[in-house]
Swiss-Prot record:
This is Thymidine kinase. Belongs to the herpesviridae thymidine kinase family. The gene is TK. It comes from the Viruses. GO terms for biological process: DNA biosynthetic process; TMP biosynthetic process. Gene3D superfamilies: P-loop containing nucleotide triphosphate hydrolases. InterPro entries: Herpes_TK, P-loop_NTPase. Keywords: ATP-binding, DNA synthesis, Early protein, Kinase, Nucleotide-binding, Transferase.
Length: 352
């Protein structure tokens, strides 16, 4: 393999920087961080790879230990020491703090991501991030709601925080179908204050699987088919306790139809009488919120990555081998150098 090109050489060959940014996401303890640690600093073509790690230092040592406190709060709610209202207020406050580092970095990065150049481009920089802001603003809050630790009203407040997505977002949802292996990985981390909560694990896996379908639906329906979405909404059943149990516990299969239906999306969870008129139609404000969620998701290029039976090394090889199929965006060289500086500063202060 030829020696990796330096940034100065690459910059002299291109009028603008070409950026691939990829978010690795999925349930907790699935192996994302291990993958990220093993990803090389340059691709096989010599393209520099920048890695943004999970902000664990911020979560655990800046003010409150969020990991310990959120698990303790949920345990106390289940023991009857907290009411749903009390646990919801605490969990939502903690979940907002989980989201803060993602949102701050996302805002800085968004201003540097310009128009899409397509796929199979010649990138000058690959940026790989451990989780997208959607994890802390949508996926974990929905899972906490499904497990009974967060109320519907607080969940609504969280999903509003999902930021607008600039062009060129590649979101890879890591999947591990072997629950026994997943539990083993989570338990073996042995992190202080972290507990192996099988109900939460199943809820998260279901939410992330459903997220892929939701993004596919958004890509099809937005922004031109709002009437079609509203018609489908009326046909959804009320999401009650039995449907919540089914959602969490029944195995989900990858949707293979020509078009995802609203029934297969996360929005079906919000078909509640508290949010709707008697005929099932959403109140205006909540309709704006859910349609806004779809509009934010529609710029995301999503893919499932099934790592069942694969070693970390094989996962990394497979992930990097498909890099040329992901979206590329234009960025200025000044922006590219700023991204590098931001990543170094963020990892130094936030990561462990």
């Amino acid at each position: 393999m030829s020696e990796p090109q330096s940034w100065s050489v690459m910059a002299s060959q291109m009028t603008s920087a070409q950026l691939i940014r990829v978010y690795l996401d999925g349930s907790m303890g699935i192996g994302k961080t291990s993958m990220l640690n093993e990803i090389p600093t340059h691709s096989l073509m010599g393209v520099p790879v920048l890695k943004v790690f999970e902000p664990m230092k911020y979560w655990r040592y800046y003010f409150t230990d969020l990991v310990t406190t959120v698990n303790d709060t949920c345990d106390r709610r289940r023991r009857g020491e907290f009411s749903l209202f009390q646990s919801s207020m605490i969990v939502t406050a903690l979940q907002s703090k989980f989201a803060d580092p993602y949102l701050v970095f996302h805002e800085r990065l968004s201003s540097k991501c310009h128009r899409i150049t397509g796929t199979r481009g010649n990138p000058s920089l690959i940026l790989i991030l451990d989780r997208h802001p959607i994890s802390a603003t949508v996926c974990f809050p929905i899972a906490r709601h499904l497990t009974g630790d967060c109320s519907l009203e607080m969940l609504i407040s969280m999903i509003i925080r999902l930021p607008q997505e600039p062009p060129g977002c590649n979101l890879v949802i890591v999947d591990l179908h072997d629950e026994k292996e997943h539990v083993s990985r989570l338990s073996s981390r042995n992190r202080t204050g972290e507990k192996t909560d099988l109900l939460m694990l199943r809820a998260l896996n279901a939410v992330y699987s459903c997220l892929v379908d939701t993004i596919m639906y958004a890509n099809h329906i937005c922004p031109y088919s709002k009437d079609e979405w509203e018609s489908e909404w009326l046909d959804l059943p009320w999401f009650d306790t039995s449907l919540a149990t089914t959602f969490i516990n029944e195995p989900r299969t990858d949707y293979r139809g020509s078009r995802v239906s609203l029934h297969h999306t996360l929005l079906a969870i919000f078909k509640r009488r508290e949010l709707c008129a008697e005929d099932g139609s959403l109140s205006t404000t909540h309709a704006w919120i859910l349609w806004g969620l779809l509009m934010k998701l529609r710029n995301i290029n999503v893919e499932r990555f099934n790592i069942t039976g694969l070693s970390t090394t094989k996962c990394v090889e497979s992930f990097m081998d498909t890099m040329s199929e992901r979206l590329v965006t234009h960025s200025s060289w000044n922006d590219a150098f700023e991204i590098e500086a931001d990543v170094l500063a963020y990892n130094k202060e936030m990561a462990m």
